[in-house]
């Protein structure tokens, strides 16, 4: 069994990465034989979907697979064989990071079929989870409708893989030394 965690944060050792590493430790505790890997998206040079539609061309060599070749190609290939994926992103302006958004465009769109059933070509269904880290108190997150803005991407993940379990990590630290910044918190 192989499980991946996808870090959509530019930071490799801060809030999101820390939570994802702990989640992978939990996977290993539940199944010591499991293979796990944390992938840092900001370590890879790639674009979002370029709208070439090669993944939609019936009978084409890339049907159901992203045809773009760049730093995301090998990651998409590995994820096709995964047994579970944990996504993680800090929240910037009520949303996931831009790099995470580009990743989802490529990961999810390749599997979408334009049919009345909203079917998907994903190689298999698998458990998924999404970790959102943010420097926002829980109550403010709810009152400001953050969760509603997250539901759109979660619905696309559900269409392709499964309904993701979610974890909201609130009131996170942004700096290790707040005395160096103007921040009232």
Question: Model segments located where?
Answer:
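Short, glycine-/small-residue-rich phosphate/pyrophosphate-handling segment
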Residues: 112-165
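A short secondary-structure junction signal
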Residues: 98-99, 139-144, 177-179
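Short, surface-exposed, charged loop/turn segments at secondary-structure junctions
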Residues: 101-107, 143-153, 183
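Flexible, glycine-rich phosphate/dinucleotide-binding loops
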Residues: 12, 45, 137, 173-175
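N-terminal beta1-alpha1-beta2 submodule of the flavodoxin-like/Rossmannoid cofactor-binding fold
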Residues: 1-89, 94-112, 185
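Cofactor-binding loop segments of dinucleotide-utilizing enzymes, especially the Rossmann-like FAD-
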Residues: 8, 41, 133-135, 169
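Low-complexity, flexible helical/coil segments
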Residues: 39-42, 71-77, 119-128, 163-170
């Amino acid at each position: 069994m192989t499980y991946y965690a996808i870090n959509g944060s530019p930071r490799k050792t801060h809030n999101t990465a820390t939570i994802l590493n702990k989640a992978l430790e939990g996977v290993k505790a539940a199944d010591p034989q499991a293979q796990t890997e944390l992938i840092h998206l900001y370590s890879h040079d790639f674009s979002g979907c370029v709208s070439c539609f090669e993944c939609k061309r019936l009978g084409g060599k890339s049907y159901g697979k992203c045809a773009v070749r760049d730093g995301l190609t090998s990651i998409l290939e590995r994820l096709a064989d995964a047994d579970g994926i944990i996504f993680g992103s800090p929240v910037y302006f009520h949303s996931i990071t831009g790099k995470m958004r580009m990743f989802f465009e490529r990961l999810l769109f390749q599997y979408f079929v334009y049919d009345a059933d909203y079917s998907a070509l994903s190689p298999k269904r698998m458990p998924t989870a999404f970790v959102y880290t943010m420097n926002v108190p829980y109550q403010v997150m709810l009152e400001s409708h953050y969760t509603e803005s997250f539901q759109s991407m979660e619905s696309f993940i559900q269409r392709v893989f499964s309904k993701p379990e979610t974890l909201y990590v609130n009131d996170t630290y942004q700096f290790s030394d707040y005395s160096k910044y103007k921040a009232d918190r």
